[in-house]
């Protein structure tokens, strides 16, 4: 009788869920107060006018309005800031 031994099992085969970070509202979009603008790790983007920051660095709109991104310089480093222009 022919026999086939069991194949080896791989030790990989697992992966963690993505954390759904990134920009949720882009420049020029209308947002409502409380809408999440960006989910991020650390301050890749800084909060500007009418934008709040949560404990986990999430940026959110404080008022209804239009999203506007702006680049600015601090200590010879170009950073990004997000504002909400109230409607």
Curated annotation (Swiss-Prot):
The keyword Ribosomal protein applies. GO terms for cellular component: cytosolic large ribosomal subunit. Residues 1-22 are annotated as: Disordered. Gene3D superfamilies: 2.40.50.100. GO terms for biological process: translation. Belongs to the bacterial ribosomal protein bL27 family. This is Large ribosomal subunit protein bL27. It comes from Nitratidesulfovibrio vulgaris (strain ATCC 29579 / DSM 644 / CCUG 34227 / NCIMB 8303 / VKM B-1760 / Hildenborough).
């Amino acid at each position: 009788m022919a026999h086939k031994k069991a194949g080896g099992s791989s030790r990989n085969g697992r992966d963690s869920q993505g954390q759904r970070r990134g920009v949720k509202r882009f420049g020029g979009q209308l947002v409502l107060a409380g809408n999440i603008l960006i989910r991020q790790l650390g301050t890749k983007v800084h909060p500007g006018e009418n934008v709040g920051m949560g404990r986990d660095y999430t940026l959110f709109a404080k008022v209804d309005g239009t999203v506007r991104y702006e680049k600015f310089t601090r200590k010879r480093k170009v950073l990004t800031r997000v504002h909400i222009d109230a409607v």
